[in-house]
C-alpha cells in the first residue's frame, strides 16, 4: 500500500515544480478558472500539449513558490505575478505565440445551465417565439412577468425579455424557466485575465492589436505631441519641422514690413513687385525639353493680353 504524502511533502513537490517552470518559461498567462470542471481542464491540457503547461493550485502556494524562486535565483521579475494571483486562478506557461495560445484556450468553453444562486456573468435575454410548452405551463411566465399568448396550442413569448441581469443571482423561477426552454445561457472555461511576458505584465486585449492598430496609435501619439509642443513652444523632434516653418514665416513677414532683408526674402519681394515673373517661373518647369519656348510663349501672351485689353477684349474671357 502506497504511503500518502504529507502536506509538507506536497508543498515541497509543488514548489519544485513551479520553480522549474519559472526557470524554463518566460511567458505566462494568468487565467480565471471559475466553474471549470476537471474533465474540461483535462481537455484544455491535451489541447495545449506541446509547448504549454497548465498549473493550478491555491493562491497561497503559488505566491509562496514564486517568492522562493525569487530568493533562490535573485530574479525579481516574477514577483510582478503576486498581485495577479487573486481568486480562483491558474497559470499557463508557454513558449508559443501568446495570441494563439489564448485563442486555443477559448475553444474549450462549454455551455452551462443557469443554476439557482449562481451570479450571472452576462445578461440573459429570452427572445420572442414559440416555446413548445403547453398552456398549463403559463404560470412560469406569469411569475416572471413575461408577456405570452397561446398559439396553436402552445405558449408563445411576444416580446424580448431581459430575464437576468449581469451580476444578479439566478433565482429559482428563472432557473426553472430556462431549464424548461432548454436554454443554457452561460459558458465557462479558462479566461485569460493577465499576460506576463519577460517581466512585463499587460491586459490580454493587447494580444488582439494588429500592426495597423499600433501604427495608428503611434501616429495619433506623435500628432498629440506635435500639437502640445507647438502650443507651449517646446521643441521636440516631431514639432521641429513645423517650428522652423513658422519661424521662417515670421521672419519673412518682418522682412516684408521693414527694410530688413535676406536672400529668400528678396525673391519673395521680387515676386510681389512683379507677379508676371511668378507666372513665368511657374510655366517654365512644365516641359523640360521646350522650357525656353514655354517662357517665350508666356511672355508673348502677357503682351498680347495687355494689347487686347486696350481693344476691349479679354484673352481669357
Swiss-Prot record:
GO terms for molecular function: mRNA binding; structural constituent of ribosome. Keywords: Phosphoprotein, Ribonucleoprotein, Ribosomal protein. The keyword Transmembrane helix does not apply. Gene3D superfamilies: 3.30.70.1730, 3.90.105.20. GO terms for cellular component: cytosolic ribosome; Golgi apparatus; ribonucleoprotein complex. One of its GO terms (biological process) is ribosome biogenesis. Phosphorylated. Coiled coil: none annotated. The keyword Ribonucleoprotein applies. It holds the Pfam family RL10P_insert. Belongs to the universal ribosomal protein uL10 family. P0 forms a pentameric complex by interaction with dimers of P1 and P2. Ribosomal protein P0 is the functional equivalent of E.coli protein L10. This is Large ribosomal subunit protein uL10z. The gene is RPP0A.
Amino acid at each position: 500500500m502506497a504511503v500518502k504524502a504529507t502536506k509538507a511533502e506536497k508543498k515541497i513537490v509543488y514548489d519544485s515544480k513551479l520553480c522549474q517552470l519559472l526557470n524554463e518559461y518566460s511567458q505566462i498567462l494568468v487565467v480565471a478558472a471559475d466553474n471549470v470542471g476537471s474533465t474540461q481542464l483535462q481537455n484544455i491540457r491535451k489541447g495545449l500539449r506541446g509547448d504549454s503547461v497548465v498549473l493550478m493550485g491555491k493562491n497561497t502556494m503559488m505566491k509562496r513558490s514564486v517568492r522562493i524562486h525569487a530568493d533562490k535565483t535573485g530574479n525579481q521579475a516574477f514577483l510582478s505575478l503576486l498581485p495577479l494571483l487573486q481568486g480562483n486562478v491558474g497559470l499557463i506557461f508557454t513558449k508559443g505565440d501568446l495570441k494563439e495560445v489564448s485563442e486555443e484556450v477559448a475553444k474549450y468553453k462549454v455551455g452551462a445551465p443557469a443554476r439557482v444562486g449562481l451570479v450571472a456573468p452576462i445578461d440573459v435575454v429570452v427572445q420572442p417565439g414559440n416555446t413548445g410548452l403547453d398552456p398549463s405551463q403559463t404560470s412560469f411566465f406569469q411569475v416572471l412577468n413575461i408577456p405570452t399568448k397561446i398559439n396553436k396550442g402552445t405558449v408563445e413569448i411576444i416580446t424580448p425579455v431581459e430575464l437576468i441581469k449581469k451580476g444578479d443571482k439566478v433565482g429559482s423561477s428563472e432557473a426553472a424557466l430556462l431549464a424548461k426552454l432548454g436554454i443554457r445561457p452561460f459558458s465557462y472555461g479558462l479566461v485569460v485575465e493577465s499576460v506576463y511576458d519577460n517581466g512585463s505584465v499587460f491586459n490580454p486585449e493587447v494580444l488582439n492589436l494588429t500592426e495597423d492598430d499600433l501604427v495608428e496609435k503611434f501616429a495619433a501619439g506623435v500628432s498629440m505631441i506635435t500639437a502640445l509642443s507647438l502650443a507651449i513652444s517646446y521643441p521636440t523632434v516631431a514639432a521641429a519641422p513645423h517650428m522652423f516653418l513658422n519661424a521662417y514665416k515670421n521672419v519673412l513677414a518682418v522682412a516684408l514690413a521693414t527694410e530688413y532683408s535676406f536672400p529668400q526674402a528678396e525673391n519673395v519681394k521680387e515676386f510681389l513687385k512683379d507677379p508676371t515673373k511668378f507666372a513665368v517661373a511657374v510655366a517654365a518647369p512644365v516641359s523640360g525639353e521646350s522650357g525656353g519656348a514655354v517662357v517665350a510663349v508666356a511672355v508673348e501672351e502677357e503682351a498680347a493680353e495687355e494689347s487686347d485689353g486696350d481693344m476691349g477684349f479679354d484673352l481669357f474671357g
